[in-house]
Amino acid sequence: MARSLKKGPFVDHHLVAKVAAAAGSKRPIKTWSRRSMILPDMVGVTIAVHNGKNHIPVLVNENMVGHKLGEFAITRTFKGHGGDKKSGK
C-alpha cells in the first residue's frame, strides 16, 4: 500500500543532514536506511546502501526520485534452480 500524500515522504533526518553536508563531495555516504525515500536534493550524490552484508554504491539520478534507497541494493543472490548435477560439468 502506498504512503498517504498528507504524511509526505519519509527520510531519516541523519541522512538529510549528511547529504546537505556532502553536496560537492565525491565520497559516498554510508547508510543503513533502506527505508528512506530519494528526494530531489539527493540527485548526483553517491549513497552506499547496506544490503545486509556490505554497502552497495548507488549513484542517484533524477529517475530515482520518489523511490526508496533499498530498491537499488539487492539483498538476495539467486544461484539458479536445482537441476541435473551431471549435466552441469
From Swiss-Prot:
GO cellular component, one term: small ribosomal subunit
Keywords: Ribonucleoprotein, Ribosomal protein, RNA-binding, rRNA-binding
One Gene Ontology molecular-function label: structural constituent of ribosome
Domain of life: Bacteria
Keyword Metal-binding: no
Entry-linked InterPro entries: Ribosomal_uS19, Ribosomal_uS19_bac-type, Ribosomal_uS19_CS, Ribosomal_uS19_SF
GO terms classed as biological process: ribosomal small subunit assembly; translation
Sequence similarity: Belongs to the universal ribosomal protein uS19 family.
Function: Protein S19 forms a complex with S13 that binds strongly to the 16S ribosomal RNA.
Name recorded for this polypeptide: Small ribosomal subunit protein uS19
Organism name: Stenotrophomonas maltophilia (strain R551-3)
Gene from which this protein is expressed: rpsS
